[in-house]
A protein has these predicted regions:
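Substrate-access "cap/lid" subdomains that shape
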Residues: 203-251
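Transmembrane alpha-helices and their extracellular/periplasmic helix-loop junctions
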Residues: 294-403
Length: 413
């Protein structure tokens, strides 16, 4: 696209044409993972050329001429009109949460920004927490929005921010962000709501998120409202189309009809790359695609908090009892075999639950608990046997032949 249409950012006339083409192809919804924070300074020559043919410019001063050129070549107006006419566009915006380590953010949301975001709140909200309850939701501190003309024209807006962990990997997305009494959904959820036209609802309890659903589909989140992303593969797992091919008519109704379309940068230098579990340089727009596909297909990864601790305790208890019984009747190599069987058996079950059932259970704790139990029994048994051998050697070495003493140490019974 950059090779065909020139460097980024493009004139807004291109973006207007892109919306018209995608909307005309019958797309279900169009989401822009792109921020348009400033007015476009580009004046399209073709628009001015057409307008000159219709206006007498013989008696016009320079100031009036510049104002007239801006009016006829107002690419922002053209883009806003395309967004409004489409009735399918969702715009993204960036947020900084409290405690964000990406920079020192002192700015707060202005009254104008709050007014711009007002229509993008959760449509249905039930709160069972009390004033003063410290509900563990992520709090929005400031935001970066597109210019008001675009936000007003869009069907909806949603934040495109993720939750990067200490290793920099994006595994979670906040499904709810709070600002005062207002609750806001993310970009991906807003797109899905627009595509399905189903009601979006959230229920807040004193401990955090109690329920979040679109229509009758309930989405699993943590108490703070974070959703664990189920990645389908490395970068470019989803179908990518060049924007220039859409603008040139090479991609149209056949490819785009009834599809959820995300528009974003994937070229080097656009700076919208994340680190995913599959590695770095993962296009941010494709992270949103994974989230939307998760929600559409209900491919959730669930952490079963209700019985997870019972499973860990059960593994430790059962492995301890079994290894303890084996240590009484069998040699160390039998214990080692039992340990390997237990570890690889658990890893197999763990892998099956994760890949086939979407259940995320602890891997490290149960495996290491078996190793620690085995190590403890082995050390205890070795110490006990050594003490018994010393006793036999001291008690019988003066009265029996060395060969007989060795036989007694090998078989104390």
């Amino acid at each position: 696209s950059l090779k065909e249409k020139g460097r980024w950012p493009w004139p807004r006339t291109y973006m207007a044409d892109l919306v018209d083409k995608i909307s005309g192809a019958g797309a279900a919804v169009i989401g822009f993972d792109i921020l348009f924070p400033e007015p476009d300074s580009y004046i399209p020559f073709q628009a001015v050329q057409e307008a000159v043919k219709k206006k007498d410019l013989t008696n016009i001063n320079s100031e009036s001429l510049m104002q007239w050129m801006h009016e006829v070549g107002d690419s922002d107006r053209l883009f806003a009109e395309s967004i409004l006419k489409s009735e399918k566009v969702v715009l993204g915006y960036f947020v900084y949460a409290e405690g964000d380590r990406s920079g020192d953010i002192d700015e707060k949301l202005t009254a104008q920004q709050m007014e711009m975001l007002d229509f993008s709140q959760y449509p249905i909200t039930q709160r069972f927490d009390k004033p003063g309850d410290e509900v563990p939701l992520r709090v929005m501190q400031s935001a970066g929005l597109s210019i008001p003309a675009f936000v007003d024209a869009a069907n909806s807006v949603g934040y495109v921010s993720f939750v990067a962990e200490v290793d920099g990997v994006v595994r979670w997305v906040p499904m709810v962000m709070q600002l005062g009494d207002y609750l806001f959904p993310p970009f991906s959820l807003q797109m899905l709501r627009e595509a399905t036209m189903l009601p979006l609802a959230v229920r807040i309890a004193p401990f955090g998120i109690d329920d979040l659903k679109l229509g009758e589909t309930v989405f699993p989140t943590s108490q703070s409202g974070d959703y664990l992303i189920n990645y389908y593969g490395p970068a470019y797992t989803f179908t990518h189309y060049s924007a220039s091919e859409v603008l040139d008519g090479k991609i149209g109704k056949k490819e785009l009809e009834n599809k959820i379309i995300l528009v974003g940068g994937t070229a080097a230098g656009t700076y919208d790359f994340k680190t995913s579990p599959y590695g770095p340089l993962y296009p941010g727009v494709e992270v949103h695609a994974n989230i939307i596909e998760n929600l559409v297909q209900q491919d959730f990864i669930v952490r079963p908090a209700t019985w997870l601790h019972l499973l860990d305790f059960g593994i430790i208890l059962v492995s301890g009892v079994l290894l303890g019984l084996i240590s009484i009747y069998f040699k160390a190599y039998a214990m080692a075999g039992m340990l390997l069987l237990g570890v690889f058996g658990y890893l197999g079950v763990d892998l099956y639950l994760f890949t086939q059932k979407g259940l995320w259970v602890n891997t490290v704790y149960p495996v290491f608990s078996q190793i620690f139990v085995y190590s403890g029994i082995t050390v205890f048994k070795f110490g006990f046997e050594e003490r018994e051998k010393r006793f036999i050697r001291g008690a019988f070495s003066q009265y029996l032949a060395p060969a007989v003493v060795n036989q007694l140490m090998d078989n104390p019974n």
